[in-house]
Amino acid sequence: MRYLLILFLFVICTLPARAAKQPNIILILADDLGYGDLGCFGQQKLKTPRLDAMAKAGMKFTQFYAGCTVCAPSRSVLMTGRHMGRTVVRGNSVEPIIIRPGQSTLASVLKSAGYQTACIGKWGVGTPDNFTNPNDVGFDHFFGYINMWHAHNFYPEFLIRNGRVVKLKNEVAQKWKAFQDPAQPRAGRGVAVKRLEYAPDLFIEDSLAFIRKNQKHPFFLYFAMNVPHANNEGGNKGMEVPDLGEFARKDWPEPEKGFGAMIGNIDRDTGRILDLLKELKIAENTLVIFTSDNGPHQEGGHKADYFDSNGPYRGIKRDLTEGGIRVPTIAWWPGTIQGGGSDDAHWYFGDFMASASELAGAKAPAGIDSESFVDVLHGKEKVRKNPLYWEFYEKGSAQAVRFGKWKAIRQPMFTGKVQLYDLSSDPAEARDQAGEKPQLVKQAVSLMEKMHTPDPNWKVRGKRKK
């Protein structure tokens, strides 16, 4: 009898301990949000009180990097934990180069650890040739856009929910009707003339419903916003919002009013998620991370310098300078993260894989380019051991590597002249030191050659040096 009592007490004590090691994880990903677009990262014109409060109660990562400088490859790095030299999707392509079933993702790892998983919003990891791609690679629930071009349209005629087409009440202009066949590679793109259902509003409601439904057991919510991206098909009227609100009275260009409203909506919706976690009394067992997929855009009539969206950094979306890849990142976890702090070590999207695996008590996939920053969340100092690496296949191609305080950029890949910057003293990358530091240039080139793995789907002009 005594043995049974001891065994019973052991089981009772052990189960809650295990549950406590599996926090809920919410990853909020803004689309084309620049480092300087939030008040807590230096924004002066636009107010972001909820995100500023989130940073004050949590912590900021001041040197956090996106996976790439455009959406599809950046999201591929995020999902696979592999950097741009080895991930599946390395560019924005209309071809069906996608993560396939059987390939490990952030979602599949967490699902295997007992998490309920959801992707709500913009999937856009390549151009899937089916409607079930997110579900096929680990998400129990999906609601949103499958391809990136569809995600340009804030008032789409349809969305996808778990492999099924969901018709909406919106209607695009006649010139875009040919793109409303869901089976087309760029299906759903266009500009609406009948605007009744704003997709970002549908996504936040679905996200809140998912949290409520799964509050009793571990969940992973990947809330992939499609703002403040522009509707590129809309020309200079691409910053589409239902209501300009307070910005309607501003003496600003119309696209900038729309951009301001989008930032306000991002702030509001993030606050709604945090409020719900508190209401459900699960905030202390939930890690929320807010970040962006790349640097600020200059599309839809919006100008990146109007709000100084890249902050103190040079470059924007489609550049491998800091402004194109360094992104505003906030972590919030009441009771675990000590409020008001910041971490200045450099991390990147691929590190979510190792970090989430550790939090879930799961084994991280083999062969990933990922290091855990969980110690940082617990207030401990930790630095990344390995270099960071990027490739980009537009604008003639480019590659970049960060090793310690140094960052090198080569454009075009393989054959271009190397630029070298000391980010500790020159974060704006204004002074190229390549001519003064030949040994560091040699080291950078060696890293670039080592970290690039050839892929027949992704080719550049010029030959790789041997």
Q: For each of these PLM feature ranges, what is it?
A:
Residues R2, F8, R18-Q419, L423-K466:
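Formylglycine-dependent sulfatase
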